[in-house]
Amino acid sequence: MTEQNELQRLRAELDALDGTLLDTVRRRIDLGVRIARYKSRHGVPMMQPGRVSLVKDRAARYAADHGLDESFLVNLYDVIITEMCRVEDLVMSRESLTAEDRR
């Protein structure tokens, strides 16, 4: 195999992993929508600081256990959590408006 072919094969493998990563992020957001609906129906506050800490701590432990940069994974989860909170807030606001409209 030529060096160029090897590079193309490696990039194709990376592209496949990127597809899996993006699909996983989409699935995580979809699950966040379901969680937001549950929270809205059961009066659970959107922000759960204990849960946020647990998720970030788990990312840091994973990084340490697998030789990855802890700050990178914690920062990555900061971005993911920020987006999840934004989505949950939107969903819960809509759920609240829908409930008020039914009265």
From Swiss-Prot:
Pathway: Antibiotic biosynthesis
InterPro entries in the record: Chorismate_II_sf (IPR036263), Chorismate_mutase-related (IPR051331), CM_dom_sf (IPR036979), CM_II_prokaryot (IPR002701), Isochorismate_pyruvate-lyase (IPR008241)
SMART domains for this protein: CM_2
GO MF term list: carbon-oxygen lyase activity; chorismate mutase activity
Residue span, Chorismate mutase domain: 1-92
One GO term (biological process): salicylic acid biosynthetic process
SUPFAM superfamilies assigned to the protein according to its UniProt record, in alphabetical order: Chorismate mutase II
Enzyme class at the top of the EC tree: isomerase
Cytoplasm keyword on record: no
EC number: 5.4.99.67
Pfam families hit by this protein: CM_2
Catalysis: reaction(s): 4-amino-4-deoxychorismate = 4-amino-4-deoxyprephenate
UniProt keyword terms in alphabetical order: Antibiotic biosynthesis, Isomerase
Role of this protein: Involved in chloramphenicol biosynthesis. Probably catalyzes the conversion of 4-amino-4-deoxychorismate to 4-amino-4-deoxyprephenate.
Stated name of the protein: 4-amino-4-deoxychorismate mutase
